């Protein structure tokens, strides 16, 4: 039993910090802004990481990866999140679209999609949620009706992050009425966002631009070549995707950085603020360790809902705890963004976004349900 | 990163678990509470025969050190009535002169099981003035302190006990993790069995919520205990690391015990139920040397003095 991530992983951390210090502008506030110049930074970061073979370090070598250890991969995710995700919206392609296409794609699909993802040149969005299918994703109903050798898509997706800037959509549609299980009859399509009949409508939200959008399909045509995996058996693919997403973002990494900055404030050495701060430090360490447990279990092929969702629960609650602590510590001075190189200058943005931590990618209630179910079945079998 | 306990360590712990189960599990704690002589008569021989009390929980031998903390965890799982953690907190080099270490905050009037360890010392949670502990008679039971023994702190001991805070804290954390693991398992099993309104109570959202919170707390403590133990074995655990674990131990116990009781309803309050016994018997472990507020203050003082290791480490503060 030992917890060191290893020399290579720590060396990678140092290298990434140097690289980001060099590439990120002074007042870097993350890529999710209207400003084209800001998004250009994300593109530059991705392409630089790609040149240095760091963008897809966890991919197998045959797809341009460096076959990095799971801990190097963890370090990469931690450093990216801690620095406000300088890869921008590309991270989805890297973290799950690419691996899913490797697993389920045809040779042609792999050739078409993997190189641009690995090169940091493409943005994907995830078209799963619908107005009537949120937590209950299996009840999704966006229709794909037969039309000659293809299908016509009609219906709506919602909450689709980055849809306005996405090149491709990873779309779940219903090709058949559910028989038996309601998840039967779902098919995954890889749809270019410029296909006729696809429209995006941004939703004005407290999170800021790009995060939430509506996505309409009005007779957009897809063919067998656009299908990922098997027709009507898309739920298999969705399960694989959710499996990749389930350990989730290493939120504790940014929280660690924010806590380190908070500890430098006047007043952090004592009083109620000091006590809350050290408690949050303990919670951040716990969240990191639970996440490491889940990563190790996934690597060993023994990950269950218990490890995946306890890690998520700890991390998302930490995110909200630290965001509140930061905004309250700053008081009225923190309500408006003050910019600068420190995370604390973006405390209000972090606070707004933290409202979604317990909702996005499966709500905390669903995580709790999964953990409880895992435990009760462990005790009854 | 290697998150596996060695096979040898696991085997030794399994042997002890079987032996403890043979003594009745939590029933042994019940029996000892009714008659403290049970501790020496029934538990001591098992601890002797398995060699648990001679192990070095922080030494270079991974099998032995792992076996020691897993043994502590197994004892905690049934709140075995013996000061195992106090004995193992003594560094091997000091065992010729010292039988047990109690970490104290100020001058305690009582310590648990102090009558069982002849040459015990008291080490302050902050500072290094080590005193001998003299037990004044046998246990005088209180509901939340079943083996409390009146003590007097006597003459100063010349040699300090290095790393006492870290060792004691890590061992207490494993003990508590064992107890909380038992409670979590009991609650999950009960939720699946107990039916109300025609359904298992595990199908109610509120009960699932509680069980999930218990799992996060108990599993988190398991991880942090092992992590801090690993730091301590490398000689890298600071007092802040130890106190962070202590804060997590107290927090986890609060979440698990409160929610555990709620899942059981009235039956969990009965003395014949293991939950009630584990809850009461764990309390002294959680409150000595200090309660949650004071422990957090001690942590803050250490973080100010030495900083705190993290992905973005907290720097020490200039405290005048
Ligand atoms: C920032 C953000 C980005 C997102 N990006 C995307 C994206 O890119 N693509 C995409 O497809 N989706 C995306 N989502 C959608 C996200 O997956 C859903 O919001 C989530 O699955 C919950 O669905 P819902 O919002 O419809 O809430 P609902 O499912 O309607 O839930 C409302 C409340 O009811 C609770 N609830 C529901 N069912 C149960 C139950 N069985 N037991 C107990 N409580 C229950 C929920 O926990 C929640 O508290 C995003 C969401 C957010 C916030």
Predicted regions mapped to residue ranges:
Chain B
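FAD-binding core of flavoproteins
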Residues: 77-185, 310-320
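Alpha-helical interface subdomain recognition
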Residues: 1-75, 170-320
């Amino acid at each position: 039993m030992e917890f060191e991530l290893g020399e290579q992983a720590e060396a990678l951390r140092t290298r990434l910090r140097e690289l980001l210090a060099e590439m990120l502008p002074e007042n870097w506030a993350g890529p999710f802004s209207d400003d084209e110049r800001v998004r250009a930074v994300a593109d530059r970061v991705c392409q630089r990481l790609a040149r240095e073979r760091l963008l897809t370090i966890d991919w197998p070598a045959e797809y341009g990866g460096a076959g990095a250890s799971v801990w190097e991969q963890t370090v990469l995710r931690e450093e990216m999140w801690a620095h406000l995700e300088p890869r921008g919206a590309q991270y989805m392609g890297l973290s799950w679209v690419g691996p899913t296409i490797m697993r389920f794609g045809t040779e042609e699909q792999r050739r078409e999609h993997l190189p641009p993802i690995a090169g940091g040149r493409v943005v994907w969005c995830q078209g799963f949620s619908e107005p009537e299918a949120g937590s209950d994703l299996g009840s999704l109903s966006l229709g794909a009706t037969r039309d000659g050798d293809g299908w016509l898509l009609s219906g709506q997706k919602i909450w689709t992050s980055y849809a306005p800037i996405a090149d491709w959509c990873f779309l779940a549609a219903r090709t058949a009425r559910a028989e038996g299980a309601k998840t039967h009859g779902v098919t995954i399509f890889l749809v270019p966002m410029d296909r006729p009949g696809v429209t995006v409508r941004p939703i004005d939200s407290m999170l800021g631009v790009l995060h939430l959008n509506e996505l309409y399909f009005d007779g957009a045509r897809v063919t067998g070549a656009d299908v990922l995996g098997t027709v009507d058996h898309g739920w298999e693919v969705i399960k694989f995707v959710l499996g990749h997403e389930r350990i989730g973002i290493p939120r504790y990494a940014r929280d660690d950085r924010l806590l380190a900055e908070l500890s430098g404030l006047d007043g952090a050495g004592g009083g109620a603020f000091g006590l809350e701060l050290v408690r949050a430090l303990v919670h951040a360490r716990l969240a990191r360790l639970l996440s490491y447990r889940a990563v190790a279990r996934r690597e060993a092929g023994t990950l269950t809902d218990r490890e995946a969702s306890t890690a998520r629960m700890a991390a998302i609650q930490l995110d909200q705890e630290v965001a509140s602590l930061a905004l309250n510590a700053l008081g009225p001075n923190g309500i408006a963004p003050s910019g600068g190189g420190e995370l604390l200058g973006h405390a209000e943005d972090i606070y707004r976004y933290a409202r979604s931590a317990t909702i996005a990618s499966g709500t905390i209630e669903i995580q709790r349900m999964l953990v409880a179910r895992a435990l009760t079945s462990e005790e009854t079998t | 990163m290697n998150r596996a306990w060695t096979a040898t360590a696991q085997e030794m712990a399994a042997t002890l678990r079987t032996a403890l189960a043979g003594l009745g599990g939590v029933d042994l704690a019940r029996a000892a509470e009714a008659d403290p002589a049970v501790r020496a008569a029934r538990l001591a021989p098992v601890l002797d025969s398995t060699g648990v009390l001679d192990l070095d929980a922080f030494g270079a031998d991974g099998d032995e050190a792992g076996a020691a903390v897993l043994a502590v965890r197994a004892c905690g799982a049934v709140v075995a009535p013996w000061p195992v953690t106090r004995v193992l907190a003594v560094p091997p080099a000091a065992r010729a002169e010292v039988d047990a270490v109690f970490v104290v905050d100020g001058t305690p009037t009582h310590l648990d099981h102090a009558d069982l360890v002849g040459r015990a010392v008291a080490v302050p949670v902050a500072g290094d003035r080590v005193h001998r502990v003299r037990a004044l008679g046998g246990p005088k039971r209180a509901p939340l302190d079943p083996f409390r023994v009146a003590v007097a702190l006597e003459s100063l001991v010349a040699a300090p006990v290095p790393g006492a805070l870290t060792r004691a804290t890590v061992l207490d954390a494993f003990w508590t993790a064992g107890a909380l693991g038992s409670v979590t398992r009991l609650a999950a099993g009960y939720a699946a069995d107990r039916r109300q309104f025609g359904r298992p109570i595990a199908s109610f959202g509120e009960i699932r919520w509680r069980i999930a919170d218990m799992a996060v707390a108990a599993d988190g403590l398991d991880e942090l205990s092992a992590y801090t133990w690993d730091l301590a074995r490398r000689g890298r655990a600071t007092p802040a690391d130890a106190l962070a674990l202590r804060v997590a131990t107290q927090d986890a116990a609060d979440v698990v015990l409160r929610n555990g009781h709620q899942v059981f309803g009235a039956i969990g309050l009965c003395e014949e139920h293991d939950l009630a016994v584990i809850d009461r018997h764990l309390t002294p472990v959680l409150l000595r040397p200090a309660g949650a507020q004071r422990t957090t203050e001690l942590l803050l003082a250490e973080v100010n003095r030495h900083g705190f290791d993290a992905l973005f480490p907290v720097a020490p503060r200039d405290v005048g």
